[in-house]
Every structure is written in structure tokens, then in C-alpha cells.
Amino acid sequence: MTSVVVVGTQWGDEGKGKITDFLSQKADAIARFAGGDNAGHTIKIDGETYKLHLIPSGIFYKEKTSVIGNGLVVNPKSLVTELKGLQERGINTDNLRISNRAHVILPYHIKQDIADEESRGDNKIGTTCKGIGPCYQDKVARIGIRMADLLDKDIFEEKLRHNLAIKNKLFEKFYEVEGLTFEEIFEEYYGYGQEIAKYVTDTSKILNDVLDEGGKVLFEGAQGILLDVDQGTYPYVTSSNPVAGGVAIGAGVGPSRVTSVIGVSKAYTSRVGDGPFPTELFDEVGQQIREVGREYGTTTGRPRRVGWFDTVVVRHSRRVSGITHLALNSIDVLSGLETVKICTAYNYKGETITEYPANLHIIEQCEPIYEELPGWSEDVTACRTLEELPENARRYVERVSELTGIQIATFSVGPAREQTNVLVDVWEA
């Protein structure tokens, strides 16, 4: 029995899909445990590019089980569209399983998300307006509709009528916008439910059975630890728990069954949306990193904010998520820079801070303290071992490991599967 959790150590978009795809080769099952279609994974296989939002990266291995766990919130319309897109490209999706306990995103969640963001004025939190937050709100308020409900026509009708009565009062009285009708939702979404019904089951049992039989399970994280609702830069966070601990809740697998946690980082930092970002770059170097790294959101298409690698952030992620290994991506993006910098601490009003503050007011006033290293001009995309990297690039990788206190398991020099280079096999570690 072995299980590996993949988490993002920054604000998402670190390349988790690439690492998950790579590690999936040795897994028997691959499961997502948090988030929804607000997170995007880009995967390159045999020269083909695939962009996933809900479906686990393991879908490309027909002999392996791919699981959408109970911790996700699922938009059936988006899921059906994504499934058809894969099927049209010749990908067999019969290995997908969806938790019957996963909550369902409905049109009123999206409408509420948009209305709520607009009502914030200048204090927007940068939501993707996919209905994620409102769906999690309903889950906690115990009025959510789960997959098991969606598949039962009578129960779905009853719950939908009840919820629409509540939501329409909210739309009309509070947001002062027009409500939604039962008719424009019911048949369409019940239809989506019937299209995906064959995939819906008790996924917790499936995953635990794999582990009981001595198999390997890979848990695919979404977003990043700094977007975690508890451990991230609140309120500029998502509504779920992307930390490794989210596996126990969102996949129905006990914490004692997790054997290792691999944190994924870029060789720099990026962020979409608002919120503090101490190492953010606004100069030509930042623009170069953005363009070379193609830093535009998979889900939103928005330009990502970019900055230097921040060890304060990654050490925080290591601590709250129990990270045992690091996957360092996008080293190739830094090629051509005369100098590269690593943030080692923050300066706050003359005080050196080495732990990530909870107070956003403090973070916004923090100045990064950098360690500067010489850059490299060589093309590293063909490097397959640490020794093949230019000396300065190799020193950069080693310094990241030293400053974060995390052993590096893989380093990547490009988006393709064969450009991921293994230093430690986490399945055997």
C-alpha cells in the first residue's frame, strides 16, 4: 500500500497536472479531493495538449481508475462538456468514477457568485465566478444537492424547488436582480445527471479497496496551499482545503494511509487574482518571465502575476501540509536572466520575518529579502540529469532545496512528460 498526495506550494498553476500525469504512470488509481472547475490542469502527451478542469489527470490511462472525490463541487454541465471533448479526441473515459457524495453546482450558484463579486465594488476577491464558493456555502448550510440527489428525479425536484425559493429571495431582495425559474434548470440538469450516472458511485470504498489490496493511489491536488481557506491568504482564497490534509475529508481516505506528500513549485512564483504577493515583479524581468512561461490562466485566460521564488511561502506550505518532497518546475523559463533571486525572509518595519503572517495588513507592508544568484544563458530543455544542467542552474536548484528544507524529487525543464527528471522515486521513498 502506497499513497502519494500532490499539492501546490504556492497560489496554484505550479504545474501539478504535469507532475500528476508523470506520477500516474505507477499508480493504480488517481483521485481529486478538492475544488471544482475553477482549477485548470494543462497536460502535454505525445505532442498533444489537453486542458482539464474537473477530470483527474489519470483519465489518460485507461487501465487506471480516475476519481472525482466527495470533496469536489461538480458542475454537471461543465463535466459533460469536458467528457465529450476528451471522447471526441479518442480518449476513453470509462475509467472515471464520481463520488455520489460530491455536491452539485447549479445555475443559481454561478448567478450568486457573479452578483456577490459585483457587489464588492473595489474589494473584489478575484473569484472565477464558477459558483464554487456559493456551492460550498450551501454544503455547510446543509441545503446542498449532492450527486446522489441529482440522479433521483423526485428528490432532485423537491430539493431544487426548496433551494430556488431561498435563492430567488436572495437575488430579488438583496442583490436586486431577477431570479431563476424551476423550468429553466430542472430538465437540463437532470439530463446531465443521467448522462454521467454510470460514473457515479461510492468512491471512498473504491480508493480504500485499492489500498487494502496493496495498490498505489495518487491524490491530485488543485490550486495551491496559499489559496487554502484556512491556511492561505484569507480572504483571497478558494472555498476548500487544497492542503494535503484535505485528502482525508475530500476523498474519504484516512490520514494514516498517506505515505508521502509532494509539493509542486515553479522555479519562480505566479498568482491569478487579487491578494498580497511580496515578491511580485512589475518590471521587464517580470514581463519576460510571463511571456516565456506563458503565464495566462487555464480557466480564465487572465495574465498571471509573476515574481521571484519565495521560500517563506514554500516553508509555510511545507509545515501546514507535511510536504516530504518538492517537484521544481519551469527551470527553463529562467534561462537568459543575468541574475536570479530567491526570497529568504521579509522585512517588516525593520523586523526580519521568516514565517508567513496571518494578517494581510502586515503582508502588504512586507519587503522581500533576497539572496541573489548568477543566472544562466544556456538552453536547459534537453537536460535529463542534475549534472547536465549549467552550473548556475544546478546551484539554483540546490539552493531552493536548502532554503526550503525540502528534498527535491523531480525537476522539470519544459512542459512535456519526458522533460520531467527524477531525483527521488516518491513511490519508493
From Swiss-Prot:
Record keywords, A-Z: Cytoplasm, GTP-binding, Ligase, Magnesium, Metal-binding, Nucleotide-binding, Purine biosynthesis
Family matches, as CDD domains: AdSS (cd03108)
Keyword flag Signal: no
Binding-site positions, Mg(2+): 13, 40
Residues annotated to bind IMP: 13-16, 38-41, 128, 142, 223, 238, 302
Top-level enzyme category: ligase
Pathway noted in the entry: Purine metabolism; AMP biosynthesis via de novo pathway; AMP from IMP: step 1/2
Binding residue positions for substrate: 298-304
Complexes and interactors: Homodimer.
Pfam families according to UniProt: Adenylsucc_synt
EC annotation from Swiss-Prot or TrEMBL: 6.3.4.4
Function of the protein: Plays an important role in the de novo pathway of purine nucleotide biosynthesis. Catalyzes the first committed step in the biosynthesis of AMP from IMP.
Ligase keyword on record: yes
Co-factor remark: Binds 1 Mg(2+) ion per subunit.
Subcellular location field: Cytoplasm
Main location class: cytoplasm
InterPro entries assigned to the protein according to its UniProt record, in alphabetical order: Adenylosuccin_syn_GTP-bd, Adenylosuccin_syn_Lys_AS, Adenylosuccinate_synth_dom1, Adenylosuccinate_synth_dom2, Adenylosuccinate_synth_dom3, Adenylosuccinate_synthetase, P-loop_NTPase
Record: residues binding GTP: 12-18, 40-42, 304, 330-332, 412-414
Cofactor(s) needed by this chain: Mg(2+)
UniProt protein name: Adenylosuccinate synthetase
GO biological process, one term: IMP metabolic process
Family affiliation: Belongs to the adenylosuccinate synthetase family.
Active site per database record: 13, 41
PANTHER family cross-referenced by the UniProt entry: ADENYLOSUCCINATE SYNTHETASE
Originating species: Lysinibacillus sphaericus (strain C3-41)
